[in-house]
Design a protein with these regions (language model features):
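Beta-lactamase-like hydrolase cores
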Residues: 2-3, 7, 16, 22-80
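Active-site-adjacent helix/loop patches that line small-molecule binding or acyl-intermediate pockets
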Residues: 3-6, 22-43, 105-218, 223-225, ...
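Alpha-helix capping and helix-loop boundary segments enriched in small/acidic/polar residues
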Residues: 78-83, 115
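Active-site SXXK
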Residues: 83-100, 119
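Structured C-terminal helix/loop/strand segments within mature extracytoplasmic catalytic/sensor domains
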Residues: 233-242
């Protein structure tokens, strides 16, 4: 019987497109230049869960402290990671001017993750007219924490990122941007977001090594722990800018 080359196995994805080949080729995953894996960095133990003094689960990670444009201390390695939901305040920066008239509840829900509580959903929905609700592309979900009557029918508004999605859709309308495919890196707001990251890192020529899809559907870009620390130090230092 002829042995099949693993790279020639049939795939539902057309040849040449991501996912068309068998991946990964090793159980430890592929290696890519300038992208260290979890086996390549010197993680530090941050939290140790014990049962009767015996360690059962240890969480490892990396930490960096920044002041202005300077890293003053770090440990665990300058690991490459995705900022994901912690980047919400920076993702809203391209829309500061057009959304400046939002009330504080609307601003808070735009820049944060939420539990899907009644007041959270109300704040998120208030950002859009009811006729615009159908544009929402965040995943279906149920409230994160439920008491009393249980919500069992998933809805987009219950998703932890629905406020951010609604705010970006509103901002794009006010800026005259097409909202078709608004969750894709090819959308008009995304290059503006990358410019914000360059500004807050003080790295005008920076480019992300990877752009991936976050759990809510929005793009998430790779940054080192040091880069994230610098951005959030500057976010605090410039908190009164807008």
């Amino acid at each position: 019987m002829k042995e099949i080359n693993p790279n020639d196995r049939p795939s539902s994805v057309s040849a040449g497109r991501p996912g068309s080949a068998v991946y990964p080729t090793t159980p430890l995953g592929e290696k890519f230049e300038n992208i260290p894996t979890g086996r390549d960095v010197e993680w530090e133990p941050l939290v140790d869960f014990r049962r009767m003094d015996v360690s059962e689960n240890t969480i490892h990670g990396a930490v960096a402290w920044a002041h202005g444009d300077e890293i003053i201390h770090s440990f665990g390695g300058n690991v490459l990671v995705y900022g994901r939901s912690m980047m919400k305040p920076l993702m809203m920066k391209p829309f500061v001017e057009v959304l400046k008239d939002l009330d504080w509840k609307q601003k808070a829900i735009s820049c944060s993750s939420h539990n899907g509580d009644t007041e959270h959903v109300a704040a998120a929905q208030s950002l859009l007219t009811e006729s615009e609700w159908g544009l929402m592309q965040c995943p279906l979900d149920v409230p994160l924490i439920q008491f009393g009557r249980q919500v069992r029918r998933p809805r987009r508004w219950f998703h932890t990122c629905s406020g951010e999605h609604a705010a970006i859709l509103k901002g794009m309308r006010l800026m005259g941007m097409s909202r078709a495919g608004y969750t894709l890196p090819s959308s008009d707001w995304f290059p503006l977001y990358l410019d914000v990251l360059r500004e807050y890192m003080n790295k005008p020529n920076w480019e992300p090594l990877r752009v991936a899809k976050d759990g809510c559907g929005f793009p998430t870009v790779s940054n080192t722990v040091n880069e994230l620390a610098l951005m959030f130090a500057n976010l605090v230092a410039r908190r009164d800018d807008d």
